[in-house]
């Protein structure tokens, strides 16, 4: 019986010690603020319905205590196509494009990854896409990181075979996938002001 009591007491002590350790790891500071490796994250220019390469930035806690955010969210949700991963958590529609209760230990950091999948803008010229990633603290204060990218509407040509005299004309860029092949006795004319961009592996091949 005595041994059983000692065992229970030891279990209680270990549980208490574990809880205290966790509290020490996340000793949340009510007034602490995070620091960022950028104040504006600029992504590449992207054609509509395609994705930019992923870029990232760091979030630092230079405080002597842990810092907790009530939420990290995209200000405009997914209206512009920005896709964000916060320390392994993807801000998708199932989460309302936000994550809650993000904590950064003292003198530690987390990494955030961002890309954008641009939709058609229905405009001739490149259009600026801009949103804010908002960090909200328990005291209601906020910090923002601005996200920027340019979206450019474009037509897509896939593995075009030119079998007769053909003219390509467009006021918006044309992205070529798979290449263009001009057969013998056929003429391909590219109208003045028309711009072609060839995707990786695509080329213009002229037979004969």
Question: Where in this protein do the model-derived segments appear?
Answer:
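Terminal connector regions
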Residues: 120-153
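Surface-exposed binding patches on compact interaction domains or structured appendages
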Residues: 21-42, 62-115, 120
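Extracellular beta-helix/beta-solenoid repeat scaffolds
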Residues: 169-208
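C-terminal motif of bacterial Sec signal peptides marking the signal peptidase cleavage site
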Residues: 16-19
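Core beta-strand segments of extracellular beta-sandwich domains
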Residues: 52-62
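Beta-strand-rich interaction surfaces with strong enrichment in secreted/lumenal proteins
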Residues: 44-45, 98-104, 135, 177-180
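Low-complexity, Pro/Ser/Thr- and charge-rich linker/hinge segments at domain boundaries
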Residues: 26, 145-167, 171
């Amino acid at each position: 019986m005595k041994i059983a009591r000692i065992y229970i007491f030891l279990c209680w002590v270990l549980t208490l010690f574990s809880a205290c350790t966790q509290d020490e790891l996340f000793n949340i500071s009510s007034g602490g603020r995070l620091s960022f490796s950028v104040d504006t994250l600029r992504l590449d220019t992207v054609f509509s319905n395609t994705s930019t390469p992923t870029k990232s930035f760091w979030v630092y806690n230079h405080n002597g205590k842990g810092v907790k955010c009530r939420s990290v969210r995209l200000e405009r949700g997914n209206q512009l196509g920005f896709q964000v991963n916060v320390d392994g958590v993807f801000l998708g529609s199932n989460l309302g494009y936000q994550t809650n209760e993000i904590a950064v230990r003292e003198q530690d950091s987390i990494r955030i990854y961002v890309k954008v999948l641009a939709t058609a803008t229905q405009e001739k010229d490149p259009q600026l896409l801009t949103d804010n990633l908002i960090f909200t603290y328990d005291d209601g204060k906020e910090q923002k990181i601005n996200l920027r990218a340019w979206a450019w509407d474009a037509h897509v040509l896939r593995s075009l075979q030119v079998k007769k005299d053909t003219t390509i004309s467009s006021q918006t860029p044309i992205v070529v996938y798979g290449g263009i092949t001009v057969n013998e006795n056929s003429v391909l004319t590219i109208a003045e002001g028309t711009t072609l961009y060839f995707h990786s592996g695509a080329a213009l091949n002229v037979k004969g």
